[in-house]
A protein has these predicted regions:
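Loop-helix junctions at membrane interfaces
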Residues: 1-187
């Protein structure tokens, strides 16, 4: 007679206490960076927000799942505290940050090198641009009350350059800051 077989359930990746504390700390830092970014002038409803730098560094360090967690937490805290955009802004915020950060972190996890970081970040910028162009085309007419034709005309002249510059600046900052920050986080 054979022993009863135990049913094995797929295990989730476990986070140790240090990882959870680091993610919480990075969430707080990302929120502060987002607050400081709000001090910069904005054009229409487009804001440069450098929290993606912190989110992506967290993802490079702890993986794409951590980047998604940090992104969701920061966007949720922002929605509850200072945002005037409500759930639509929350969704847009999470989509933009995850499109950039999770894409970059996933590729970096697979190709763990400087080349992988650059490739991941470049793909993250491309994903950010694609997602935000689609989101702006679909939601901005509803949210801002603009005719869809007006928004469609703004895609190549306003939204495309804005998101390319935003993604490019975030990419440059990450490439400069990643090694020193990661060295400090791993201590």
């Amino acid at each position: 007679m054979s022993a009863p077989s135990a049913v094995q359930t797929p295990s989730r990746p476990k986070m140790d206490t240090k990882t959870m504390v680091s993610i919480a700390m990075l969430t707080g830092i990302a929120y502060i960076v987002m607050l400081l970014s709000k001090l910069m002038p904005s054009v229409m409803f487009l804001d440069f927000d450098f929290k993606d730098v912190v989110v992506c560094i967290g993802g490079f360090t702890f993986g794409p799942f951590a980047a998604a967690i940090i992104s969701i937490l920061v966007a949720f805290i922002e929605m509850l505290t200072i945002s005037h955009t409500g759930p639509i802004g929350f969704i847009m915020n999470v989509l933009a940050t995850c499109a950039f950060s999770c894409t970059a972190c996933f590729i970096y996890k697979k190709v763990h090198s400087k080349k992988g970081a650059v490739l991941g970040l470049a793909c993250g910028v491309a994903c950010l641009v694609a997602v935000m162009l689609l989101w702006n085309y679909l939601i901005t007419p509803i949210y801002q009350g603009l005719p869809r034709e007006t928004v469609a005309a703004m895609l190549p002249t306003v939204f495309l350059p804005f998101n390319v510059v935003k993604g490019g600046l975030n990419m440059a900052l990450i490439l400069v800051l990643y090694k020193p920050v990661v060295t400090a986080l791993r201590k």
